[in-house]
Amino acid sequence: MQSTEAHMKEKQRREKIEIIFSHRVKGESYFHGSSYQWKNIVYQNYNRIQQKELKIEQLISEMEKEGIRFTQHRSLIHYPVIDFVKYIAKVYKETLEKQ
């Protein structure tokens, strides 16, 4: 019985991740390449952002280090990143405090 419950939780977790990564963010065109790449970096750092260990500006620098290129000025990159962080919080039913 416990393995069925664990299987259901894992299935729900995967479904949430699928929903998160398939969500279109206004400003996705500000990034060169696959949206999965930059979204994955944001997703992996979501907890650090939520706990205020990492600022959006630092996250954008991290994205550059990982090879993500931007088609717009760096100051505009904040908007799609913030929107995506807010969407992750919404899917997980968590609240975010403004940074």
How does the language model describe each region?
Residues 24-25, 42-45, 66-74:
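Short, local alpha-helical segments
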